Structure formats: C-alpha cells, structure tokens
Amino acid sequence: MPGSSSRSSLAHLRNRLSECSDLQSLYEVAVLLAISRRLRSSLVSRSLSCVSKQKLIAELTGKDPDAFICMAVSLRWSEPIDLLYAFEEMFIRASCTRRFADCRDFLDELFWVSSIVDSHKILDKTLSARFLPAYSKKQLISGVFAGAHEGTLAVLEYFACYMQKKRAFRECVFFAEKIVADELGAQIADVTTERPLSREQRDELVDVLSRRFKRRIILREVINEKVFGGVRVQVNHSVIDDTVAVHLNNLALSFGALETFS
C-alpha cells in the first residue's frame, strides 16, 4: 500500500492526465525508471530541484519533457518505486483513451491474454524470466498474442521486458486490468463456476455485486469443472464462495467441533 504522499500525488495525476500531450514520453520515462533505481531515487529526492529533475529527464530522453511529466516528478512520493508505478498507470490510462476507440476493447483483450497465460503456466514463467533477453520476449508476445491491438502489445511488451524483480507477468496483466476497469468506472469480479452462467444469472449477479460494492461490476467468468455446484466470486480481496465444496467443508468442521466437546 503506497504512503499518503504517493496516494495524494497519484490522485492528482489521474485528475490531470488529460493535460499529457505525449503518450510515447510516458512510456519512455517508465522504461528509464524501471531500469534505474538510482534515477527513481533522484527524481523523488527533495534535495534536487524541479529544474534539475527536468534537465535530467531531457538528457536521458533527448527531448524536453512535457508539462505533465514535469509535474509528476515535482510531486512528493513516499517511495521511489511509487513514481515508477505511477508512470506505468498513467501510460495504461492514457493508452485507454488515445489508442482505443472503446476502453472495453482494451479490457477484453487483457482478459483474453490472462486466459491464455492462466492456461499455460510455462508462458507466465518464461515471460517473467530474468535471463530471457527483451527481443526474445517481444518475439514470443507478438507470436502468442498475434492479432492483438498495438496498444495491448505495447503494454505486454513493457511488462515482460521491464517488470520489477518481485513481480510476475500475470501479476502485471492483472495490474493493467484493474487500471483499465477503473478507467471504465468499474471493478472486476472473477466468477468461477462449473458451467457457464445463463444471461439471467449473469445479470442478477452483476446487480447484486453492484449494490454490494456500490460500483459498476464487470464479470470475468472462469469455467472450472473441479468446482462442484454454486459459484466462487472474487472482487479485489473480497471472496464469496458458495460452492458445495465449501459447504461440505464447513459441515465437516462443525462435526469436528461437536466431537471435540462430546
């Protein structure tokens, strides 16, 4: 969880993102921050003036940063890594509105990517591997996800090549999904069932979850034949598990408790 300074700065950037005039520069600065811990520390340092920070970015990118990027590095950040995550988020949000006619198309493609990665664990391990060179990862992404929008491919290639050590590729895609959903004013609900829900069931579930979480809900349905009856729903860290397996487990625990006191 980011500190209060980072949360405040991030909220400010979200409100001012429309002022960003250069999507490519967001990407370039994110890459620079991803590969250089020293640069991250310098750009959040309070001992370095805003003018010096702007000059540093200009030297590294070969061009003067736009006003939005200057504003981002002038804000206060709790930790250096928070500045990197902020640029990643701004790049994804800006991609939603500037590369896609409909943000939902972006989210649907990310869902498609997730389904492939979840079905092929070796793909996640390969794209998360530190030893694999960037050009090999880019070739793999363009091959596996052929036909994806260039905006989607740009985000996937960025995370595959520049993700931080403690993150995995699938985790980064999930990060992107949450941002795009938020840009749509929604939250994602992962629904795991034994068989596909009917349209009526989906509509009813969306209505119930929307009222519970007080926000628009977008369902991502996962079919798992190992799930016996009922549904399992996860929205962020909240889990609602109404499967038969859970009910049987609770029943078994109840019998165990009774035996303890018998």
Swiss-Prot record:
Membrane topology label: Peripheral membrane protein
Cellular component GO terms, alphabetical: plasma membrane; proton-transporting ATP synthase complex
Disulfide-bond pairs as recorded: none
Classification via InterPro entries: ATPase_OSCP/d_CS, ATPase_OSCP/dsu
Keywords: ATP synthesis, Cell membrane, CF(1), Hydrogen ion transport, Ion transport, Membrane, Transport
Pfam families: OSCP
GO molecular function (one): proton-transporting ATP synthase activity, rotational mechanism
Record localization: Cell membrane
Highest taxon above the source species: Bacteria
Entry function: F(1)F(0) ATP synthase produces ATP from ADP in the presence of a proton or sodium gradient. F-type ATPases consist of two structural domains, F(1) containing the extramembraneous catalytic core and F(0) containing the membrane proton channel, linked together by a central stalk and a peripheral stalk. During catalysis, ATP synthesis in the catalytic domain of F(1) is coupled via a rotary mechanism of the central stalk subunits to proton translocation.
Sequence similarity: Belongs to the ATPase delta chain family.
Description of how the protein assembles with itself and partners: F-type ATPases have 2 components, F(1) - the catalytic core - and F(0) - the membrane proton channel. F(1) has five subunits: alpha(3), beta(3), gamma(1), delta(1), epsilon(1). F(0) has three main subunits: a(1), b(2) and c(10-14). The alpha and beta chains form an alternating ring which encloses part of the gamma chain. F(1) is attached to F(0) by a central stalk formed by the gamma and epsilon chains, while a peripheral stalk is formed by the delta and b chains.
The protein's name in its UniProt record: ATP synthase subunit delta
Lineage: Bacteria, Bacillati, Actinomycetota, Actinomycetes, Micrococcales
Gene assigned in the entry: atpH
